[in-house]
Swiss-Prot record:
Protein purpose: Co-chaperone that binds to numerous kinases and promotes their interaction with the Hsp90 complex, resulting in stabilization and promotion of their activity. Required for cytokinesis and chromosome segregation in mitosis and male meiosis.
Provenance organism: Drosophila melanogaster (Fruit fly)
Residue list for modification Phosphothreonine: 19
Name the UniProt record assigns to this protein: Hsp90 co-chaperone Cdc37
Biased composition, class Basic and acidic residues, residue ranges: 1-11, 361-378
Span list, region Disordered: 1-26, 342-389
Length: 389
């Protein structure tokens, strides 16, 4: 047979309870609930006090018994103290018994009438890492340009931060920066800073770049979105084991070394490109470099071009074998060191000038004649030692 007596004494407010017309029912329920909560808080406080006294009693009891067994001190005084402590223990037992009886007589209420039979915890699944999109090189380059155009200032602000807490807060406020694009931008910026010989600033930006790369690597290991790993990484790096920190610092040093190497390569490439452009600008009509051609000439021909002596050049060419002379002169023409048929061109110009002078009834002076004679000589371009250097 089921005993329903325990359900007779329940302190639960009911909307159908009879109350005085002048008393607001909701207010009455609130007062009752407040009084019940205060009684429960007082009961819990009494339990805590009793527990503390019980612990103190047991510690003192063990201490006195140990001292009596070791005969440490006045035996009579110790026995009296033991009797006193045991009396306190009996009093504590009585208080505990009364408290249990009082608790049993306490009516059930909405807070004590039931207990949870089981609990269920639901943990949200972390956001999965976005799969790498199959983009062509042109599309990736276009996306990178658009990202830099929209977020270059933010990337530079992140690269200049020094404290981990500041970096964590900044990335959490700008989660769209957590990605490969930011890491790539920081790499390029580090190379440019190294090329500008801003070594300390490069080292700082390199540190921030490695932080971003560690976040991305952590996301790959956990197979989650990188934005979900920002807090985890900075918490880990601030309270990490010495081995992890040493590995992190080693990665930074290796990265800085690669940046310095790449910067030197780009500088050499820029120098080589500038030299190539300069060489192309001075190429002759045949596509040969006059400096290279000049260096390949025999010493006697070099002396002719350096002294700009046409007669000496003609004598030197006449003294050389025909095949060798043709080869050298062809190279001089292709490089622009020598301009062929210059005398004919200048001669035609002279005849035109002479006809103009005759029509005007003017006679040439000795100076004009000497100038005309000079124009009959072939024209060539010389090469100075500065061009060779």
């Amino acid at each position: 047979m089921v005993d329903y007596s325990k359900w007779k004494n329940i302190e639960i407010s009911d909307d159908e309870d009879d109350t005085h017309p002048n008393i607001d029912t909701p207010s009455l329920f609130r007062w009752r609930h407040q009084a019940r909560v205060e009684r429960m808080a007082e009961m819990d406080h009494e339990k805590d006090e009793l527990k503390k006294k019980r612990q103190s009693y047991q510690a003192r009891l063990m201490d006195v018994k140990e001292r009596i067994s070791k005969k440490d001190g006045d035996e009579e005084a110790l026995k009296k103290e033991l009797e006193k402590i045991e009396a306190e223990g009996k009093e504590l037992d009585r208080i505990e018994s009364e408290m249990i009886k009082k608790e049993k007589k306490t009516p059930w209420n909405v807070d004590t009438i039931s207990k949870p039979g089981f609990e269920k915890t639901v943990i949200n699944k972390k956001a999965g890492r976005k799969p790498d999109e199959n983009l062509s090189e042109e599309e990736r380059e276009q996306r990178m340009k658009q990202f830099v155009k929209e977020n270059e200032k933010l990337c530079q602000q992140y690269g200049m931060l020094r404290k981990y807490d500041d970096s964590k807060r900044f990335l959490q406020e700008h989660l769209h920066l957590v990605g490969e694009e930011t890491a790539n931008y920081l790499v390029i910026w580090s190379i440019n800073l190294e090329m500008e010989e801003k070594h300390e600033l490069m080292a700082h930006v390199a540190h921030q770049c490695i932080c971003m790369q560690y976040i991305l690597e952590l996301a790959k290991q956990l197979d989650v979105d990188p934005r979900a790993c920002v807090s985890s990484f900075f918490s880990k790096i601030q309270h990490c084991h010495p081995e992890y920190r040493a590995q992190f610092d080693s990665e930074i040093e290796g990265f800085k070394g690669r940046i310095q190497k790449r910067a030197q390569e780009k500088i050499q490439e820029a120098i080589a490109q500038a030299e190539e452009e300069e060489r192309k600008e001075r190429l002759g009509p045949g596509g040969l470099d006059p400096a290279d051609v000049f260096e390949s000439l025999p010493d006697e021909l070099k002396a002719c071009f350096e002294s700009r002596d046409v007669e000496l050049l003609q004598k030197t060419i006449a003294a050389m074998p025909v095949d060798v002379a043709k080869l050298h002169m062809k190279r001089c023409v292709d490089s622009g060191l020598w301009v062929p048929n210059a005398a004919d061109l200048e001669g035609d110009k002279k005849e035109e000038d002479d006809s103009d002078d005759v029509a005007g009834g003017e006679e040439k002076t000795d100076d004009a004649k000497s100038e005309s004679a000079a124009k009959e000589e072939p024209i060539y371009t010389g090469v100075s030692t500065e061009d060779v250097d």
